[in-house]
Amino acid sequence: MLVLVVNCGSSSIKYKLMDMEQESVLLSGLSERIGIAGSRIKQENNKGEELVLEQDLPDHKAALETILKCITDAKYGAIKDTAEIKAVGHRVVHGGEKFNKSVVIDAELMKVLEEMSELAPLHNPPNIIGIKTCQELMPHAAQVAVFDTAFHSAMPKHAYTYAVPYEYYEKYKIRRYGFHGTSHKFVSHRAAEILGKPVEDLKIIVCHLGNGSSISAVGNGVSQDTSMGFTPLPGLPMGTRTGDMDPAIVPFLMEKEQLGVNEIGNVLNKKSGVLGVSGISSDFRDLEDAASKGNERAELALNMFAYGIIKYIGAYTAALGGLDAVVFTGGIGENSKTMRAKVLNGLAYTGLQIDEEKNNTRGKEVIVSKPGAPFVAMVVPTNEELMIARETKELV
């Protein structure tokens, strides 16, 4: 069974064609700068043959039409006809309270999905455009929506409720939703496989660390709490997002800097985080390089990030009533031995010791703690596309 996994952003589309009988990748690609000058598609098939196509892609429909031509290209593609694709799995950022699991999209559910856009106005609209376009271009294929928020829908009410007047929850569904759920689910379940135990029997903290970062407490195989909230803004300080902060700072800054609602939103989401603190970059590789050369603000940004992770691990260990594994994933979690060491050294009070040789790896599954620790520290590369494809296959 062939499944096409699609992730539509505001100006990009990531895609991966998978044969789910072997869970193998036939090809993967990226269409970028959609609707912007210099748009292109870059694709590589499982033979290592790379296609780079530079042409005008005015909108998502044009991009997806071109992507389907690339997928069926005689030399660089992987199939002869799109009719071979049985289902398309779409990443959808926000499912609200109405979608607590993946669903096959029909006309009725599409209306409900469109209503969710007010909860994620930057992310859900392009996700929906992707679904509608694939329905039009591949009417034979089932369209499945896999939600970033779904894995966190099992959180207990006391974990997701905010202490604002309850009527706001009833009227506007203001609550903690959490994000990166597909990654947290894949990684926690894979960690359990590596440890040789049922995920339901383990207490796991997953640290998804990248330009956007979130931490989740996984117990009984589901998310019990997570660091992101109503939006992806709270939690850890991120590439350009503030993370947790006193909300009273918002009206204070709006008054002092004469900022409107959209302007303060832009500051908190696009100009803050480690970029705002360091004044250098939102890329942690740049910060590690600058810190190694003595840049104090870069070092401060890195220390703030590590400190936030350590605090969340401590809090979630208490919330779970114990801990079996801390799992690092995402671009930073998988590749930065420096950040992993900062975090794990902060947990040395538990008796955990780092295996320096094993920690000196990038992008591989590995246990980085020495034997005898009270819990296991490990790296598990995430694979959101595979998780989306699996959930799509289950529903079709």
From Swiss-Prot:
Give the annotated active site. Answer: D148 (proton donor/acceptor)
* Pathway the protein contributes to: Metabolic intermediate biosynthesis; acetyl-CoA biosynthesis; acetyl-CoA from acetate: step 1/2
UniProt: substrate binding residues: R91
Q: Which organism is it from?
A: Desulforamulus reducens (strain ATCC BAA-1160 / DSM 100696 / MI-1) (Desulfotomaculum reducens)
Gene name per UniProt = ackA
Q: What protein is this chain from?
A: Acetate kinase
Query: A GO term (biological process) for this protein?
Result: acetate metabolic process
- Name the domain of life: Bacteria
Nucleotide-binding found in the keyword field: yes
- Give the multimer and partner information: Homodimer.
Q: Where is this site: Transition state stabilizer?
A: H180, R241
Enzyme Commission number(s) from the entry: 2.7.2.1
Q: What is its main location?
A: cytoplasm
